[in-house]
Amino acid sequence: MAMPFEIEVLLPGELSPAETSALQKCEGKIITFSTLRHRASLVDIALSSYYINGAPPDTLSLLEAYRMRFAAVITRVIPGKLLAHAIGVGTPTPGLFIQNTSPVDLCNGDYICLLPPVFGSADSIRLDSVGLEIVFPLTIPQTLMREIIAKVVARAVERTAAGAQILPHEVLRGADVICYNGRRYELETNLQHRDGSDAAIRTLVLNLMFSINEGCLLLLALIPTLLVQGAHDGYVNLLIQTANCVRETGQLINIPPMPRIQDGHRRFPIYETISSWISTSSRLGDTLGTRAILRVCVFDGPSTVHPGDRTAVIQV
């Protein structure tokens, strides 16, 4: 009979009573493992396990690690060991709960993603007796995750441009701000490693070039139809008025008219272009962002989970 995948994290005997008590308060928080084993050590979940060539990770490095590593929820801390259940491996754990480690509220039904600390101080615990530190990922709603990822990648592009003297250092923007559920939050991203920034920018530029190419050809093919419908449809008329730059640029390009029949044998059939464009946008989100691993599922009690509170979840 299939069972939940339980992991035993062995705790060193050098831990002080205060550190053991602090670990017990971490029940419900999420940790990640580079490999799945039924028995692991405390070093496997410490911040040092994320180091790259001996250097501490930055925001993009942690984000990439969360995409590649296996997540698990701390279910119990007993003398000598820490018990955790892996997410997405084995049968779902009945009665699973997590602790909201983000500064934003979680609502019933929210899909939860893992993000690095981007709101200033990290949710972490220091174990000075063994020289280790554990940094817990943030439990962020998927809807908010998309906006945060966009701002982090945009900030990485800005830092890279400034470092390459493409953009003067004096014109760097201030801190990024997001609003969620009527509250204002300030993002503090840590971007130190060029590898993570370069990989994100390379992915962004490649997808951007492909999307612009497909989108311009699609728009040029649809302009005659939009011009005809603009006199009758207010939405289409507004769309045409807001696309003056693209239309003026398109007038400089002499592209032969495309046949109306879509038989799939030409390079840029309209509906195939639409499908390819949508698929590209989806892949870009999957490449830069992170997937949801849990969903808030509250049957009784308040539907809003405040920071630091615990809530029941189901695996997705």
UniProtKB/Swiss-Prot annotation:
Which species does the entry assign this protein to? Varicella-zoster virus (strain Dumas) (HHV-3)
What this protein is called in its record is Triplex capsid protein 2
Principal localization?
A: virion
Assembly information from the UniProt record: Interacts with TRX1 and major capisd protein/MCP.
> Which family does the similarity line name?
Belongs to the herpesviridae TRX2 protein family.
Question: A single GO CC term, please?
Answer: viral capsid
Cellular localisation = Virion; Host nucleus
Please give the Pfam families that the UniProt record associates with this protein. Herpes_V23
HAMAP family in UniProt: HSV_TRX2
MF term (GO), any: structural molecule activity
The signal peptide annotation in the UniProt record is none
* Alphabetical UniProt keywords: Capsid protein, Host nucleus, Virion
Biological role stated in the UniProt entry? Structural component of the T=16 icosahedral capsid. The capsid is composed of pentamers and hexamers of major capsid protein/MCP, which are linked together by heterotrimers called triplexes. These triplexes are formed by a single molecule of triplex protein 1/TRX1 and two copies of triplex protein 2/TRX2. Additionally, TRX1 is required for efficient transport of TRX2 to the nucleus, which is the site of capsid assembly.
